[in-house]
Amino acid sequence: MTCTTFLVGKKASLDGTTLIARNEDGGDKPNPQRFVVINPENQPKHYRSITTACEFDLPENPLSYTSTPDADSSYGIWAAAGINSENVAMTATETSTTNSRILGLDPYVETGLGEEDFTTITLPYIQSAREGVERMGQLLEEYGTYESNGMAFSDKDEIWWLETLGGHQWAAIRIPDDAYVIAPNRLNIDWYDFESSDTIYSTGLKEFIDKNKLNPDFDGYNLRHIFGSSTIKDTRYNNPRAWYVQNYFSPETTGNDDPFNQDLPFICHANRKISIEEIKFVMSSHYENTAYDPYSTTSSAAEQKLIRPIGLNRNLELHVLQIRDNIDKKLAGIHWLAFGPNSFNSLVPFYARVSDTPTCYRDTKADFDPTKMYWLTTMTAVLGDSNFQGYVDKRDNFDLNTMAKLRALQNETDKVSDQSLEAVNEKLAQIALTAQTELLGKMVISGSNHMKLRFDFND
């Protein structure tokens, strides 16, 4: 998937929690999403990929976990992300890049694993973020992959980022507690220390690099230089997303005036602690206050179409997976979720330790149905795109008021762990659904006064 990932260590976040977020993006046509819980009895014992027919038995005693699969399962599950009942989170995947030197040595495995499979075969079987890396690495070395991907794992203490490097090679790195990462669709890890306790990698990776003379740098190992790309497409499709977010959070240290820069850093440090609301902003961003904003009223059409925004029509869902410490384990995992294009939606803080999810998020169908949140938010975004400047104030008021109501209910729930979290999630869903419906209604009423098919006549 052509996604964008954002990671925040526990000392870099406003409330001291680990946060891993990703926009799951698709093609230009809608690809409806569901929000479900997979309980142990519903987890397959034998897995078979629809894309490649790769198959094998899965371990016994899986954990329950949240996920956001496609409504149309004919192409596979595509579980995307979730939090398991041990409060370990995973998001997979960020489609990335490679180069011909690597594929000539370690080609893709057409019968291997890919984004369709990773979450389903990993998340129910791990007790920590580090275990997630180890299981994923073992699967990659055994079965291989048919694409280049990045994925994140988190628990209450750690965040790990893993990238595939060809068909079987891979490397992972622990994100420092005081750091953040913005990862577009390129190979993202840069400087890498093979001797560090904060790195894990495939068997013989350093020897593979040295033996095949793959390192272009005189000193050190930069995995992006070795395994990644540096193309014209990167300058317009990938690098600008990292550029905008780094200028937003750390202009003093990583900010610059070049959105096409091929060597933007991987590990970054913000000039303030990062909130959920700010994550929502950057994951919805379209280069606001720059000439590259497609909704700009002052820049040229060429500038507005030059680079790929983070928030766009292809957003299927945004998840922010939060693992909290110093709170009852039952309440610790929060699966923040927003469906559809991020320009006109809101994140909802669903509790992850549940056995079911709200129907307006769970029962999404492939056909249009505005009573389901995915279709309602998508419809709102389509209308909003027709006159963004005319609707943006209504959007901002909706976002402020909706988040305040959701946070108020969350704050009350956090005080009492012995309650039905399924019922709380239903209340959260209804707050969001009502607010989204009201926003759409206000936009329709306002927009009707500005239709081209009109004629002013006093009678």
From Swiss-Prot:
InterPro entries: C69_dipept_A-like, Peptidase_C69. The keyword Amino-acid biosynthesis does not apply. Keywords: Dipeptidase, Hydrolase, Protease. PANTHER family: LD30995P (PTHR12994:SF17), SECERNIN (PTHR12994). The keyword Protease applies. It is an enzyme of class 3 (hydrolase). GO terms for biological process: proteolysis. Its EC number is 3.4.13.19. Gene3D superfamilies: Penicillin V Acylase, Chain A (3.60.60.10). It holds the Pfam family Peptidase_C69. It catalyses: an L-aminoacyl-L-amino acid + H2O = 2 an L-alpha-amino acid. This is Probable dipeptidase A. It comes from Lactococcus lactis subsp. lactis (strain IL1403). The active site is at C3. GO terms for molecular function: cysteine-type exopeptidase activity; dipeptidase activity. Belongs to the peptidase C69 family.
